[in-house]
Structures are given as structure tokens and as C-alpha cells.
Amino acid sequence: MSGGKTQPPTGPRGKVVMLKTARKRSVASQRWLTRQLNDPYVAAAKAQGWRSRAAFKLIELDDKFGLISKGSRVIDLGAAPGGWTQVAMKRGAAVVVGVDLLPVDPVPGATLIQGDFNDDDMPARLSSLMGGKADLVMSDMAPNTTGHAATDHMRIIALTELALHFAFDALAPGGAFVAKVFQGGSEKQLLEPMKQRFASVRHAKPASSRKESSELYVVAKGFRPNGLQD
């Protein structure tokens, strides 16, 4: 794998690969496979040793917002398959703990927990494991999509709210939170509690996020445990 300054792929795409439709392959599956084969980020992730193209999203967000500092403690919610955990380790975090309901293959240097981050004792458990509270809580989680935009939007907002309230318990003063949301209007309901507890709140859509996708990332920095009183 290349070093911490790995950059996303640039330049024109290569030859477009088209797949013949197999009898047992659905149209949606056919479309997904064709897109994967022609996605430069998928190819670059494989070539550079990242477990998913999503690694480039965190690389871009970190380059822009300075989320991962040397020696920091990082929690990766919904860590599978481990791409964001890899990036955090490669960029100098001292302690990285990934949590997911699914099993995740080991990432050198990181601790991976198969469990539910929403368990009441999880923030305290992770704080004890890391030797202190986190400097960054990050989430690239998304619920299973239904194809109905409004439903999918509300589902990810609810999931991100859970991640945000986890971060309130898990973050050290001055810490940061980054999470994926889908655009659709209701993401604004996240802003008020975030503005109460963080010094700055921004939205960003990395270049590696597919143009047709409604996903964007909310980035909050300067955590204030006591809200505006701090």
C-alpha cells in the first residue's frame, strides 16, 4: 500500500467495459457490475491496497479539513470492510477502533469489534480500550437502500443521528465528527444539535463520491462537551 499522501486517481478513464447480460443476473446487478468495472476509483483502490473506493473519500475529507492528526484516537463506526480504518492508521492515528455488526478482516495496528455501537456501554468500553476519549468519530454507514429516495433519506438521517449522539459521549473536547448523509432536506435537522456542540459544521461532497449519488458528508470540528457554555 502506498503512503499517507495517497491521491485519488486523475486523468481520463480507460476503455469502457461492457458485460453481456447473464441469464441469472438481474438488470440492477448487471448495471452495478458494469459501473464497478469502469470506475477508476475501484481500480485505484485495488491497486493501492485499499479495501474499498470509499477510502478516497476519507483521504479527500482529511486533506480538506485536517481530521486525522498524528497520535490521535479514532473510532470508525460501521467499519466494514475496513477502508476508512486503513486510512486512519496510514495517516498517523495512534489508536483506531472500528465497530461493525459484521465481521471485519484484521487491519494492522487497529482494533476491530464486532458489535453494536448503539449499546449503552459502548462509549465507555471504547474509551477504556483507547486509554481516553476519541479525537475523531467517523461514520461512513448507510442503511440498506429501498430505491425510494425519501425513505432512504430518512433512514440515513436516523442512523446519523444515532452516530452523532454516540459521538457526544465518546469525543474528547475539541474532537471532530464526520458522517455520511443523503441529501433530501431533512439533513438540516442534524445541524442544530451539531452547531450547539461543535465550533464549526460544514458539508462536503468529495470528488470520489459518484456524481449521481445524493450522498454528502457532514464535518463538525471543535467539540464542546457542555455546548455553547464552553
Curated annotation (Swiss-Prot):
Its main location: cytoplasm. Keywords: Cytoplasm, Methyltransferase, rRNA processing, S-adenosyl-L-methionine, Transferase. InterPro entries: RNA_methyltr_RlmE, RNA_MeTrfase_FtsJ_dom, rRNA-MeTfrase_E, SAM-dependent_MTases_sf. Transmembrane segments: none annotated. Signal peptide: none annotated. GO terms for cellular component: cytoplasm. Specifically methylates the uridine in position 2552 of 23S rRNA at the 2'-O position of the ribose in the fully assembled 50S ribosomal subunit. This is Ribosomal RNA large subunit methyltransferase E. It comes from Granulibacter bethesdensis (strain ATCC BAA-1260 / CGDNIH1). The gene is rlmE.
